[in-house]
């Protein structure tokens, strides 16, 4: 074998390449008079990571154990040569091998007898990767399963497998896909029978490549001949040839290296003459698995296999299966199997020979073939050709994949697609490969398939991701919540919670694109159970006439609560009762006439929409809505008739360049940044609607609304009556917006404008109008606030929102909105058009009185529920016969200042306004500013005081400026010191100081470095360190136990010595040295020692102690010897000074 390194992963098997192997041949000899039984060996060979499985050492040449015995015993041999490079990473990783080649020796059996003979061919279980308890064949291996030949009609079987694979990229338990493999099936035949009975039992060979628990594996690239046997009549030898070539396994735990370029040849075998008795041919059981199947065999992609066949009796023909598969890489995922395609296979042939007088039984093999990840469920890789006799389901046509039957609901695979979808077997995501074309009318569904370009999705299925191409509908499901993104050109639908996007999608007229329920032909269809989420339509989306593109579940004309008036729908859809997320359509989608593009629900004139909750809907740059069509974001309607409804709307934005033709409606909800407003009162003509919550509506640059069209945010209609407590959102119209005659551009009670703040009820709304905006006579341009160039005057407790409007804005009558009206300088109100707005100033929390102006006596004013401030700027020209309720001032051809009605302070207008004609009392001047101290006392400029840990100063403008009081930094303490902090009652800052560290013991402080004895244990001494106490225990090395009365303690009362009769005793000694002598008094140890019993922990028993009185201490002394010639000789000796009872085995002191 030749292999590259295994890169990473636990239990990862190194890939192999360039190996070739040849299978040896074997034959059985003739039989004799005695009985013989040939039992071939069971060879279990594993390359990597198999628990409890034997493995062949890399580079080793092994001959499987052979045996030679009496008649009929056959010898078998296996030749394996392997060379390995290092294993790079991972626990349980097997080094890769290379350059291996092996040849199988031949064996033959000696003469047998006329009795029964049994030859057992192998049972080959082949697995590629990661199967628990399942054997695997290394990718690219060519194997011939052991064959058997017995009595009449018994046919031997063989298997040839050749596989080539690309790398397995990532994932735990991921199996590398294989491609380009071809295999040939060896043939076998049985010889004529004789007089004796014979049984052929194939050998059991378990071969696995990687990561199988308890499963043996064959080293990649190794050439192995399974143990062969030759015995009495009819016994045939078996052989296996395996050749593998692999690329590296990249990453992942339990990942199997992919293989490529392998070829193998199958050895042949034949049986000798048999007997006339009964014969049974038991062919091998070949279990082949590719990846991750628990107890389920699978065929490696690209493998060509001929399942072992068996033949018995006259005319019995064995069956075989040839599978050749080519696969793409498996990219990622746990237990994910790469898809395969373009496979072809050839079936090996087998035949049975003539039989004799006995009965014969032929049991063909059971071949279970599985591609990926099915628990106990066999599956065939797409493109595989499989013979009958296997427990597989339907095989698709035209290259389509096959789905298993008998498990959870499996989908049907359809013509024109190379895709297999499974439901309920393994949770995952099913997608259609990019650039794949599915012709119109085709369909590919998970649970339910519909025909005619309309898709139906079961509402009770778990969420998933579906990718749809034009002209057909395709839905799938997955239980994985999260985001899903569709491939460009493929719309997507499903019930999965998350975010989905559409990119440059074209939906053909009459087709449907659903998130949960599909609209067909532009008409609304009810649906339930849709998922909340976000759907966006990106640039270039075109929805033809009659189409419906819906976000959530839609229903037709749902009514809730009492209502009056007829309900009609324009071409498009009216839906209700759904919950959706955020919808956005990006630049240049074109919506043809009669179509509808809804975020949640939409309705046209005289329709009622109830009970919906939407997110944010936006139509961006260049959106074109043809006449009669509607582009709605949330629950919108035009001219809603009477009825009580409660609706919560999201946010809708229409960007610049949007064109709405005559008769169309662009209904959008309001609410800035996805936050809906609340309480807007909108409705149709002469209709009062309460409790509707709206958000923000915005019309972008250059938007053009043609005559008769409407651009509504909260479904606001002309001549409407208000209800108390309305709240508005934020509406902006940028410069250059043109609203043609007869059209309406309604916000939430919205406005054209920018940069200003307005509030209806309590919520603040920002409005403003840019120069050049023109509203033709008869049109509606209703705004929440149109401010004038007014400079706000402040007062105590009042913050007046400053607003501004440029000149040149003309408005028309026939519309009224509650609130304050502010008209800029030079603004002209032309007959037939009314420009109304509402303003509430921040901090006041009131709504200003509205203005109702017009030329007809029938126009009435509107009074708000709260008082506020009303102002008109200078040079305002209004039409005659204006009736005002609240605080307004009107006159023909004169400039009037507003009348102020406010319980608190009132802000005045510009200087010119104060000098013009006035109606009402002038506003009182605010009191002069005064600084107040913490107790309410007045302070003068320059005064400084402290309050609540703040240092306050009265400035020259007589305003109080308070800043947090600055605290001093804590000191830095030295080694052996610690920082002590405390906070005094009269200060806001903590005060810190350093003090020496001490150790507190028994209410006594000890300085660092000091030590003291434990009063309860004199052998323990404590030392005070910077980190705390340190205990020191004194050691008494020579201390032996004795009774308390015989103990003599030292000064610390810790260690002691034992009293005994063993003591030094003086003795006179004559010393002779070099002829010189002297008599000296020395000391010796004299006394008795007590015998004790001690426990020896080494030998686990008691033993007697043998103690002797021996010297314990000594000293050197010098003496002078007298010589015979009268001279002296100095001499030194050791004088014993102490004695004790010591172990005689102890070495004496030196």
Curated annotation (Swiss-Prot):
Lineage here is: Eukaryota, Metazoa, Chordata, Craniata, Vertebrata
Q: What is this protein called?
A: Apomucin
Q: Compositional bias (Low complexity) spans?
A: 1-36, 46-79, 86-117, 127-160, 167-198, 208-241, 248-279, 289-322, 329-360, 370-396, 473-506, 548-558, 590-625, 790-833
Q: List the disulfide bonds.
A: 1062-1109, 1076-1123, 1085-1139, 1089-1141
Quote the entry's note on domains. Answer: Contains tandemly repeated, identical sequences of 81 residues.
Name its cellular compartments.
Secreted
What are the ranges of the sequence repeats? 1-44, 45-125, 126-206, 207-287, 288-368, 369-391
What function does this protein fulfil?
A: Apomucin is part of mucin, the major glycoprotein synthesized and secreted by mucous cells of the submaxillary gland. Its highly viscous aqueous solutions serve to lubricate the oral cavity and to protect it from the external environment.
Domain CTCK: from-to ranges? 1062-1146
Q: Which GO terms describe its cellular component?
A: extracellular region
- SMART domains the UniProt entry points to: CT, VWC
Q: Give the start-end ranges of region 6 X 81 AA tandem repeats.
A: 1-368
Keyword entries, A-Z = Disulfide bond, Glycoprotein, Repeat, Secreted
Boundaries of every VWFC domain copy:
929-995
Q: Among its keywords, does the record have Disulfide bond?
A: yes
Q: Does the record's keyword annotation contain Ion transport?
A: no
Q: Map out region (Disordered) in residue numbers.
A: 1-730, 776-925
Where are the compositionally biased (Polar residues) regions?
442-459, 507-517, 537-547, 564-586, 626-635, 643-661, 688-697, 706-729, 779-788, 875-908
Q: In which tissues is it expressed?
A: Submaxillary mucosae.
């Amino acid at each position: 074998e030749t292999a590259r390194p295994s890169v990473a992963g636990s239990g990862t098997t190194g890939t192999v390449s360039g190996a070739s192997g040849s299978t040896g041949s074997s034959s059985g000899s003739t039989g004799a008079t005695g009985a013989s039984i040939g039992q071939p060996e069971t060879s279990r060979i594993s390359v990597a990571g198999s628990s409890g499985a034997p493995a062949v050492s890399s580079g080793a040449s092994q001959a499987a154990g052979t045996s030679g015995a009496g008649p009929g015993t056959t010898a078998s041999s296996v030749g394996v040569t392997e060379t390995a490079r290092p294993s790079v990473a991972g626990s349980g990783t097997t080094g890769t091998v290379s350059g291996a080649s092996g040849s199988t020796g031949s064996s033959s059996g000696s003469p047998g007898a006329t009795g029964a003979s049994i030859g057992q061919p192998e049972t080959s279980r082949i697995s590629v990767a990661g199967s628990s308890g399942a054997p695997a064949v290394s990718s690219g291996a060519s194997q011939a399963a052991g064959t058997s030949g017995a009595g009449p009609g018994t046919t031997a079987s063989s298997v040839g497998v050749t596989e080539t694979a690309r790398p397995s990229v990532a994932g735990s338990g991921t199996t590398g896909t294989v491609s380009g493999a071809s295999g040939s099936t060896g043939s076998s035949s049985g010889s004529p029978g004789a007089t004796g009975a014979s049984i052929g039992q194939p050998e059991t060979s378990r071969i696995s490549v990687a990561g199988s628990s308890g499963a043996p594996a064959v080293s990649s690239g190794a050439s192995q001949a399974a143990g062969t046997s030759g015995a009495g009549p009819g016994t045939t030898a078996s052989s296996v040839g395996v050749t593998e070539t692999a690329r590296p396994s990249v990453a992942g735990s339990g990942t199997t290296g992919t293989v490529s370029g392998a070829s193998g040849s199958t050895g042949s075998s034949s049986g000798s003459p048999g007997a006339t008795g009964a014969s049974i041919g038991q062919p091998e059981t070949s279990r082949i698995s590719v990846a991750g199947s628990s107890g389920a065999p699978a065929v490696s992609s690209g493998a060509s296999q001929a399942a072992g066949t068996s033949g018995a009796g006259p005319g019995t023909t064995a069956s075989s299966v040839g599978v050749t598969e080519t696969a793409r890489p498996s990219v990622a995922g746990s237990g994910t199997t790469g898809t395969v395609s373009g496979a072809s296979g050839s079936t090996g042939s087998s035949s049975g020979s003539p039989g004799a007088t006995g009965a014969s039984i032929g049991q063909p093999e059971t071949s279970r073939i599985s591609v990926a990840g099915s628990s106990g469920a066999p599956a065939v890789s797409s493109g595989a050709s499989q013979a009958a006799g296997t427990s597989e389901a339907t095989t698709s046509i035209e290259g389509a994949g096959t789905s298993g039957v008998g498990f959870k609901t499996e989908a049907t695979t359809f013509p024109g697609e190379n895709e297999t979808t499974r439901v309920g077997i393994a949770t995952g995501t099913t997608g259609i490969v990019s650039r794949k074309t599915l012709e119109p009318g085709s369909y590919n569904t998970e649970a339910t398939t519909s025909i005619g370009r309309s898709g139906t999705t079961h509402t009770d299925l778990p969420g998933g991701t579906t990718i749809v191409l034009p002209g057909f509908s395709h839905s799938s499901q997955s239980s994985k919540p999260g985001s899903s993104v569709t491939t460009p050109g493929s719309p997507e639908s499903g019930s999965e919670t998350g975010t989905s996007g559409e990119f440059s999608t074209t939906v053909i007229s009459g087709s449907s694109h659903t998130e949960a329920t599909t609209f067909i032909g532009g008409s609304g269809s009810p649906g339930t159970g849709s998922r909340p989420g976000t759907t966006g339509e990106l640039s270039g989306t075109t929805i033809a006439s009659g189409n419906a593109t819906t976000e959530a579940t839609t229903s037709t004309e749902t009514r809730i609560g009492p209502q009056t008036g007829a309900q009609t729908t324009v071409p498009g859809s009216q839906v209700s009762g759904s919950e959706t997320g955020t919808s956005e359509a990006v630049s240049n989608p074109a919506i043809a006439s009669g179509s509808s593009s809804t975020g949640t629900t939409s309705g046209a004139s005289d329709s009622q929409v109830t009970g919906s909750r939407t997110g944010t809907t936006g139509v961006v740059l260049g959106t074109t809505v043809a006449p009669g069509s509607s582009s709605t974001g949330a629950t919108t309607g035009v001219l809603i008739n009477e009825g009580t409804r409660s609706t919560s709307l999201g946010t809708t934005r229409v960007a610049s360049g949007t064109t709405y033709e005559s008769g169309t409606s662009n209904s959008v909800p309001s609410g800035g940044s996805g936050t809906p407003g609340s309480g807007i009162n909108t409705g149709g003509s002469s209709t009062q609607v309460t409790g509707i919550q709206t958000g923000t509506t915005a019309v972008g640059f250059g938007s053009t609304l043609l005559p008769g069209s409407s651009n509504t945010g909260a479904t606001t209609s002309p001549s409407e009556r208000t209800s108390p407590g309305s709240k508005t959102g934020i509406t902006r119209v940028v410069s250059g917006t043109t609203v043609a005659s007869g059209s309406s551009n309604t916000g939430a009670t919205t406005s054209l404008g920018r940069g200003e703040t307005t509030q209806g009820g309590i919520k603040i709304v920002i409005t403003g109008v840019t120069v050049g905006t023109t509203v033709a006579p008869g049109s509606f341009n209703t705004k929440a606030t149109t401010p004038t160039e007014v400079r706000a005057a402040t007062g105590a407790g009042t913050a007046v929102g400053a607003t501004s409007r440029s000149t040149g804005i003309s408005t028309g009558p026939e519309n009224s909105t509650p609130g304050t009206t502010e008209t800029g300088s030079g603004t002209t109100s032309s007959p037939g058009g009314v420009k109304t707005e509402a303003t509430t100033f921040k901090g006041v929390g009131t709504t200003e009185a509205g203005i109702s102006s017009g030329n007809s006596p029938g126009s009435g004013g509107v009074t708000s529920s709260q008082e506020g401030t009303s102002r008109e700027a200078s040079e305002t020209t209004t039409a005659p016969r204006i009736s005002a309720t609240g605080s307004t001032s009107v006159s023909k051809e004169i400039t009037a200042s507003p009348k102020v009605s406010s319980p608190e302070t009132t802000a005045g207008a510009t200087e010119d306004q104060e000098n013009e004609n006035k109606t009402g009392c002038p506003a009182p001047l605010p009191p002069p500013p005064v600084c107040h101290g913490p107790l309410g006392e007045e302070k003068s400029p320059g005064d400084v005081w402290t309050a609540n840990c703040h240092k306050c100063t009265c400035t020259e403008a007589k305003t109080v400026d308070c800043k947090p009081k600055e605290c001093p930094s804590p000191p830095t303490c030295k080694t052996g010191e610690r920082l002590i902090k405390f906070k005094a009652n009269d200060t806001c800052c903590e005060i810190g100081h350093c003090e020496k560290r001490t150790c507190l013991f028994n209410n006594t402080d000890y300085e660092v470095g000091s030590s003291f004895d434990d009063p309860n244990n004199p052998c323990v001494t404590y030392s005070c360190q910077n980190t705390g106490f340190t205990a020191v225990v004194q050691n008494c090395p020579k201390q032996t136990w004795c009774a308390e009365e015989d103990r003599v303690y030292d000064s610390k009362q810790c260690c002691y010595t034992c009293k005994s009769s063993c003591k030094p005793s003086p003795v006179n000694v004559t010393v002779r040295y070099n002829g010189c002598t002297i008599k000296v008094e020395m000391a010796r140890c004299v006394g008795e020692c007590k015998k004790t019993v001690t426990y020896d922990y080494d030998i686990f028993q008691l033993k007697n102690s043998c103690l002797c009185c021996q010297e314990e201490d000594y000293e050197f002394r010098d003496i002078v010897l007298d010589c015979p010639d009268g001279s002296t000789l100095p001499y030194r000796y050791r004088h014993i000074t102490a004695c004790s009872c010591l172990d005689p085995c102890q070495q004496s002191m030196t």
